[in-house]
A protein has these predicted regions:
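N-terminal binding-site loop/beta-alpha segment at the start of enzyme catalytic domains
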Residues: 1-120, 127, 193-197, 383
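Beta/alpha (TIM)-barrel catalytic core signal, keyed to glycine-rich beta->alpha loops juxtaposed to Asp/Glu
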Residues: 2-22, 49-50, 55-57, 73-74, ...
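Short, well-ordered coil/turn segments that N-cap beta-strands
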Residues: 29-34, 61-64, 89-95, 158-162, ...
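Conserved, mostly hydrophobic/aromatic
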Residues: 36, 58, 66, 81, ...
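Active-site mouth loops of central-metabolism enzymes
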Residues: 37-50, 129-147, 174-181, 325-331
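Short, well-ordered amphipathic alpha-helical segments that serve as non-catalytic structural scaffolds
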Residues: 54, 140-153, 188-191
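A solvent-exposed, charged loop/short amphipathic helix patch at secondary-structure junctions
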Residues: 116-134, 269-284
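CE4/NodB-like, metal-dependent polysaccharide N-deacetylase domain
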Residues: 144-164, 237-240
Length: 384
């Protein structure tokens, strides 16, 4: 497992190679502000080999945040992360490993009949109640997450996962009422609190796509205030003093900056903009005005939540082109480096993930960290 002393030792090994605030606080110690993502690529042995080499190169070069998910590449991404960690010269205590559960995974390759596979492997075996499945493959019920967490530990060949995300919980809102989804999440938070107390995970979070960057009236909106309230209730039920909901993940890049620009969340209690209703009961907060809401990044910062950004270079699209007016404000020798530095410059962001399915990309992406990020005022000025 990652430790405070291990992650700080990793940071110290690189001396002054990187720019200001390249390493940032993240439980239990520090992590790089550029992380390696493992979403892209076909589920093949050849891509496994590329990822293995890329992860090894990243760990050697100054990236100690590795992000994956059980459904990525039919469980192959988790397995290759485990292989690379086992072979790396970096100590396990130096590396923050995060994974996710929510989408039922295939095993090694996509089956000819995905629906039949889900039925035979998960429904017929009583792992998942079909009534809780949304869009045929997504469930956030505690029994399902418990099973997926165990499988992730096995795939990664680890005793502990440093950060475990409930994966795209807003998917449930496509077929279920918000109150029911919040109830399911609270039950799953209780499960994760027990797994945290048992030492199986360090902390937990919510990895999202829509939930925190859309307005409260949107179908897939989730309230951070409500989620934190539900996490506190889950911790109380388990007998834990402080809940373990410490991280959110959301997409953020030059062309998808909603987490900074969209007033999607209720103002935190005690702030000047706070309204009378935090949404603790699971309502969508439709009655709040824009003046009573803040962005997801601002809310997370005020609430003490770490933010990890995904799609930092837009699945490579932004490696080719950034609007000239924005590029002029960003440090970096290449467009990809500028895109990475935009994401990790946003106020409140801890780490920006970049998919690195090939070792050829590692040197360029890591080198983005040798440039200082924008200060808060300079970042704000981009949007003026």
């Amino acid at each position: 497992m990652a430790t405070d002393s291990g992650t700080w030792a990793y940071r110290d090994r690189f001396g002054d190679r990187f720019g200001r605030t390249y390493f940032r606080r993240f439980p239990p110690g520090v992590c790089s502000s550029i992380g390696l993502g493992t979403y892209l690529g076909e589920p093949t042995d050849a891509v496994d080999d590329e990822y293995r080499a890329a992860i090894t190169a990243a760990l050697d070069s100054g990236i100690n945040m590795i992000d994956t998910a059980i459904n990525y590449r039919c469980q192959r991404s988790e397995r290759v992360v485990g292989d690379a960690l086992a072979d790396s010269e970096a100590d396990r205590e130096e590396v923050v490993v995060a994974t996710k559960g929510g989408f039922l995974p295939f095993d090694g390759s996509q089956p000819a009949d995905p629906g039949r596979y889900i039925r035979e492997q998960y429904v017929d075996t009583d792992i998942v109640d079909p009534d809780t499945l949304v869009r045929g493959s997504h469930s956030i019920e505690p029994g399902v997450i418990d099973h997926l967490l165990d499988r992730s530990l096995s795939n990664l060949d680890l005793d502990r996962i440093d950060c475990y995300y409930v994966h795209n919980p807003e998917t449930q809102l496509l077929d279920r009422e918000p109150a029911a989804v919040y109830d399911s999440l609270e039950a799953t938070f209780e499960l994760l609190e027990r797994r945290r107390a048992a030492g199986d995970i360090g902390c937990y979070g919510l990895a999202t796509w829509e939930a925190f960057r859309v307005p409260p009236s949107a179908e897939q909106h989730l309230s951070l205030a409500t989620l934190l309230d539900r996490a506190a209730r889950a911790a109380d039920a388990v007998g834990v003093d402080d809940h373990g909901l410490q991280v959110i993940q959301l997409p953020f890049n030059v062309e998808m900056a909603d987490a900074f620009t969209q007033a999607s969340q209720p103002a935190p209690p005690g702030s000047d903009d706070a309204g009378s209703d935090s949404g603790g009961g699971g309502d969508r907060l439709d009655g709040d005005t824009d003046d009573e809401r803040v962005s997801a990044l601002e809310y997370a910062h005020e609430a003490g939540l770490h933010v990890v950004t995904s799609a930092s270079i837009g699945q490579a699209a932004l490696a080719e082109s950034i609007p000239p007016a924005i590029a002029a404000e960003l440090a970096g020798d290449t467009t990809a480096q500028q895109a990475i530095n935009f994401a990790r410059s946003a106020p409140g962001v801890t780490t920006s993930l970049v998919g690195m399915s090939s070792p050829d990309h590692v040197d360029e992406n890591v080198a983005a960290g040798t440039f200082d990020p924008l200060g808060a005022s300079a970042f704000d000025a981009i949007f003026e």
